[in-house]
Amino acid sequence: MFRARINEILQKDGIHSVGFIAGGIKLRGVFLQLSSELKVGSEVYVGFKSTDVLLSREALSGVSSENEIHGKIMSLSLGEILCTLRFEGKISFDVLISAHSAQELALREGDEVLA
């Protein structure tokens, strides 16, 4: 989890699109429920599952993902099936991907990647 400030809230038919700023990075999330106490300018903690993160060596184009964070792999543990790593950039978090994906990307500690 990391701290962020809400900079935009769009709502239509009970669905909320929320813009955040965290560490100078603009992020966006879509939510089915949102507390009525949250407003533009509210400070919040943002969290997501470590399995919800995609990693790439290059900027992605032609995909529906809006969030892109530049950073570095600080630690990496490669198992037979899963790979856990620590991603650090302007915000930091843990990532869980398949060992096969980590090997295909030839990921190593110290590599710069996009999440």
Label every model-predicted segment.
Residues 3, 26, 33-75, 101-115:
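Glycine/charge-rich catalytic "coupling/switch" loops of P-loop NTPases
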Residues 9-15, 76-82:
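Short, conserved beta-turn/loop elements at beta-strand boundaries and strand-helix junctions
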Residues 13, 22-24, 48, 80:
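A generic beta-sheet turn/junction motif
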Residues 79, 88-90, 100, 108:
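A short, compositionally biased micro-patch
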